[in-house]
Every structure is written in structure tokens, then in C-alpha cells.
Amino acid sequence: MTLHVQSAVSLRPFNTFGVDVQARLFAQARNDDEVREALAYSAEHDVPLLVIGGGSNLLLSGDVQALVLRMASRGIRIVREDCLEAIVEAEAGEPWHPFVQSCLELGLAGLENLSLIPGTVGAAPMQNIGAYGVEIKDVFHGLTALDRETGELREFALQDCAFGYRDSVFKHQPGRWLILRVRFKLSREANLHLEYGPVRQRLDQLGIDKPTPFDVSRAICAIRSEKLPDPAVLGNAGSFFKNPLVAAELYATIKSQHPGVVGYPQADGQVKLAAGWLIEQAGWKGYRDGDAGVHKLQSLVLVNYGHASGLQLLNLARRIQADIVERFGVELEMEPNLY
């Protein structure tokens, strides 16, 4: 067996909240064989298996009585290309932002709006990550996953993944599919998405009237760096709450009481609200309780100022959820996976 299994390992370096909890067992899988070895070890020793990537979408509420398997596989390859587009495959353990930059350097467009999102390639399809008008589903071509129930490999095409807003089939079958590698359909011609005002405004400020995908990436990196704290400096998991979808009637009621409410009508008649606006209006922006708090510049982001426990962060999140229900009648859903 090439898999190196360690005991009693701190997970602080492996979650972006910087929560200091221990894993009963810990290993890193660099290839498919080591993934299978981890599954066999889990079964043989009757210990649960928790698979993580960059730990950027994870809230650990206590010590983990499991084998924590960190996906550490690396590799980027073009599997098919012509003069118009290319299919690029990346291993699950590839860090997301460097992968985006690698594709741009290859002259391939499509991922630039997803620049500087933390995490790994393998985790990206699980919640259909998105930003500034682009989601994974818009550039997704396929993925290879291991069925933990049968040990067999399965190929997923776009229609198999049931992608939705921060949602996919993988979130609805937790613990079954272990994503090994993902393929993206990228273009050699720029088809830029500049619908979001801040992106266009930043490009205008830079005096760029004919932006390239690189320009869009740089603009978005600058915007995200200003809005979101660096997890290496201040522990966080990015946006902690999803933007809620509400009925048009509830939106009208809220708007009558709060004319400044931010809402985006959806094709199905619902309205997507800005969770950050709701949290800020409720007075939580900049709130701090010990080392657990809400970021002073971005209400959507919960932060660990140093030694907050996962339970303290979770309790803060639940207090915010309860307050938003009481004030607006809106339920906020947490984005990070809780363990």
C-alpha cells in the first residue's frame, strides 16, 4: 500500500476557516490507486471516510472521528482541440485559481469570471460554483467519478449532473460519488460575460475598452481581493450563505417595508434576494463575538479572528439565520458543508 495514513492530525492547515480540530486518521491521495486504497482502508477498519479538497467549503464543528482523505492529485491536459475550442481535463486535486490561470495562458477562455475562487477542481462541480454571471455548468463538459458503493468508475455528462444554483446531483447523494477529474469545454475566441456592473466599472477605471479574458480575470481578482478577506490572513470560507429564492409575493411585502431591498427576478417567477443586504440591514455587518464574527466589509462572510471553534462559528450562523427569519420571513441556507 502506498497510501500513508496518519493518526491524530490537526486539520487547521486543511480548512480555510483555520478551525483547529483533529482528524482521527488522515491521508492524501495523489492518484486513483491511493483513492481506492483509502476506500479499502475505511471498509477494513470500519471507519467513516470524509473526502476534502481545499477545505474552502467546509465548517468543522468538532474533532472528526473518520479517515479524512485530502485529494492531492495533480495534472492538466488537453484531451481534444481544434481551431475554435478545446476540452481540458484537470485532476480533482488541482487548486482552482491556478487552473484558471493555466487555461488563460493556453489561450482558452471561459473560466475568467471564476478567477480567485478558493478550492480545488474536484469540488467545483459539487456546488456548481459561480461568480459574476458564469457557473460551472456553462463550461462543463464531463467528469469521472468513483462510485463508493460499487467501486466502479462512472462518466458524467452535463445532463447527468442536475446543476442548479450552488447545487448538483453530487450534493443530493452525499458520500456516494468521489470526483476524480473534471473536463471543461473552453473557447479559443473570447465570449466575455460583462453583465455585472462592478466588472465593467473596474475595466472602465483601468481604461480598457476592448478587454481580453486576461483583463477580465485581473479585474475580477482585484474586485474579489477588495471584497473578500484572504483566508491565509483571516480564516473564512468565502460567502457563507446562499442568496435566497423567495416567492414574488414575499418579495413585494419586503419591498413595501424596505424599498432598498436588492432582488433579481427569475425565469420561474421567484425572486433572488441578496443575502448580504439582508444581513447588513439586520445589523450583523462587523459583528464579533470572541473570535467568531461577520466581516466588517462583506456581510456574507463569517470570519475566524484567530481561535474560534467551528461550533462558535456555527452558533453565530444560526443566530443570523433566526434573526433574518424573524425580520424578513426569509430562510438563509448555509453554503459550506457542515461536519
From Swiss-Prot:
GO cellular component: cytosol
EC number: 1.3.1.98
Reactions catalysed according to its record: UDP-N-acetyl-alpha-D-muramate + NADP(+) = UDP-N-acetyl-3-O-(1-carboxyvinyl)-alpha-D-glucosamine + NADPH + H(+)
Cofactors (names): FAD
Enzyme active site: 166, 239 (proton donor), 335
Pathway: Cell wall biogenesis; peptidoglycan biosynthesis
Keywords: Cell cycle, Cell division, Cell shape, Cell wall biogenesis/degradation, Cytoplasm, FAD, Flavoprotein, NADP, Oxidoreductase, Peptidoglycan synthesis
InterPro entries attached to this UniProt entry: FAD-bd_PCMH, FAD-bd_PCMH-like_sf, FAD-bd_PCMH_sub1, FAD-bd_PCMH_sub2, MurB, MurB_C, MurB_C_sf, Oxid_FAD_bind_N
Example GO biological process: regulation of cell shape
Record keyword Cytoplasm present: yes
Stretches assigned to the FAD-binding PCMH-type domain: 19-189
Listed GO MF terms: FAD binding; UDP-N-acetylmuramate dehydrogenase activity
UniProt xrefs under Gene3D superfamilies: 3.30.465.10, UDP-N-acetylenolpyruvoylglucosamine reductase, C-terminal domain, Uridine Diphospho-n-acetylenolpyruvylglucosamine Reductase, domain 2
Compartments (UniProt record): Cytoplasm
Sequence similarity: Belongs to the MurB family.
Job description of the protein: Cell wall formation.
Protein name per the record: UDP-N-acetylenolpyruvoylglucosamine reductase
UniProt lineage: Bacteria, Pseudomonadati, Pseudomonadota, Gammaproteobacteria, Pseudomonadales
Gene from which the chain derives: murB
